[in-house]
Amino acid sequence: MQEIEITVKGLSYSQGKSGAYALILAEKGPDARKLPVVIGGAEAQSIAVALEKSIAPPRPMTHDTWQNMLDELGTQIEKVLIHRLVNGVFYASIYARNEHGAQLIFDSRPSDAVALAVRVDCPIYVLAS
């Protein structure tokens, strides 16, 4: 299946679910289709902080800690892939490469994968269906 590169277009408070946010992902280009993904408040905050480069939290957020750990272990995130939707739940994988060149694939919630992707500036893809 074809992987389509997408970007984070924004975050919006979800009127339907208390404490939930919609992460708005979109294709690149003029006729960009949008993909809303419902995420939790903590994940929305983490993504917002990472997108707004001028904000520096006084202590590392969870995704900052993950990034720091991967950096110390010599592992680089190469891409994020949102690849499945089952019963209203999206599934994602984080593709990384360790210092020995081995590819690693981690199962992830899309919100966590995107929070890491925006921190390390790696591409985000969705499978065409």
What are these regions (language model features)?
Residues M1-S129:
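Divalent-cation
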